[in-house]
């Protein structure tokens, strides 16, 4: 039986800083690995999730030069939890600014969950800048998928956890959970915001792995939850600021020439495996791996194994 791959050993960033976007945001970025290695950009999830030192370990440090960054309003980027000038297209422009700052012509784009959404939006806008793509836990931000996770679908698998999400809502508000939480997450009362943020964030933290994870507790930490919930709800309220429900699938022909690996857990409750299947049907050149016995998170054993194989293989080019 094949031994499952794990992360590369921990490593420090060799450079870091903040990029001033010119419209009120400062984006935290860092570079790790080999300064002369193959360029890659890591796009985190959420939106609002931020980067972790573990994310550096997805890439061979001897063969990759990896740029990681906290998207607007989250992680170490400032202002914290800000929704102003914070849309998908602002983030696409930020990635281009970071590419130019790093002196990179083309790079591998790695994104999971919301990171796969943003990776697709970026690649479809700037296909000439993308050498390869590694996508995990596919999320194309269609209304039906939001309804599954925030209204009626995943709730049937986690009824006791969903009950906590509904606990602060009236019967009438429960008809549109995203809208009801929008009211609270943009309230003038910081305590109302924080209460809603923690419930929203913990719901995701407790449902993204097939088996319970100790790391889900971090989703309830005040600073993380506030940015995560406010930004995520903001994007979902506006349907990702996309032109249409099928924009990312419709525009796949723009990127079909880019080598790509798609990895998705069979029992992903946050982003159904149908998302990956639909993307792969639109993109037959892409390599699809549906991982049995796995949920949504990148660090579940079978998912991580496929991601590591993909980054190693692309580094060999």
From Swiss-Prot:
E.C. number(s) listed in UniProt: 3.4.11.5
Coiled coil: none
Catalytic residues (UniProt): 113 (nucleophile), 268, 296 (proton donor)
Record keywords, A-Z: Aminopeptidase, Cytoplasm, Hydrolase, Protease
Pfam families: Abhydrolase_1 (PF00561)
Protein's cellular compartments: Cytoplasm
One annotated Gene Ontology cellular component of this protein: cytoplasm
Domain annotation AB hydrolase-1: ranges: 41-296
GO molecular function, one term: aminopeptidase activity
One BP annotation, GO: proteolysis
Reactions listed under catalytic activity: Release of N-terminal proline from a peptide
Gene3D superfamilies (alphabetical): alpha/beta hydrolase (3.40.50.1820)
Subunit structure: Monomer.
Function: Specifically catalyzes the removal of N-terminal proline residues from peptides.
Similarity section: Belongs to the peptidase S33 family.
Protein name: Proline iminopeptidase
Gene (name only): pip
């Amino acid at each position: 039986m094949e031994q499952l791959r794990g992360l590369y050993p921990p490593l420090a960033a060799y450079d870091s800083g903040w990029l001033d976007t010119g419209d009120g945001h400062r984006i935290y970025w860092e570079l790790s690995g080999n300064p002369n290695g193959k360029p890659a950009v890591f796009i985190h999830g959420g939106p609002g999730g931020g980067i972790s030192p573990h994310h550096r370990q997805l890439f061979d440090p001897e063969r990759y030069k990896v740029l990681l960054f906290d998207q607007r309003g989250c992680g170490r980027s400032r202002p914290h939890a800000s929704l102003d000038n914070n849309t998908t297209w602002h983030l696409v422009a930020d990635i281009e600014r970071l590419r130019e700052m790093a002196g990179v012509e083309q790079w591998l784009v790695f994104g999971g969950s919301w990171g796969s959404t943003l990776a697709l939006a970026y690649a479809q806008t700037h296909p000439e800048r993308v050498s390869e793509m590694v996508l995990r836990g596919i999320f194309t931000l269609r209304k039906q998928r939001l309804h599954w996770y925030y209204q009626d679908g995943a709730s049937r698998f986690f009824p006791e956890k969903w009950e906590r999400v509904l606990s602060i809502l009236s019967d009438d508000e429960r008809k549109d959970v995203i809208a009801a939480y929008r009211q609270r997450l943009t309230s003038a009362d910081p305590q109302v915001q924080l209460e809603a943020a923690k419930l929203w964030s913990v719901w995701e933290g407790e449902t993204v792995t097939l088996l319970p994870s100790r790391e889900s507790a971090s989703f309830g930490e005040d600073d993380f939850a506030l940015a995560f919930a406010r930004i995520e709800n903001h994007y979902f309220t506006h349907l990702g600021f996309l032109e249409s429900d099928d924009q990312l699938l419709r525009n796949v022909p723009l990127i079909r020439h880019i080598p790509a690996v798609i990895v998705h857990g069979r029992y992903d409750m946050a982003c159904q495996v149908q998302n990956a299947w639909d993307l792969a049907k639109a993109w037959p050149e892409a390599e699809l791996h549906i991982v049995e016995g796995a949920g949504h998170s990148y660090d579940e054993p079978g998912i991580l194994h496929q991601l590591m194989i993909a980054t190693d293989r692309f580094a060999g080019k």
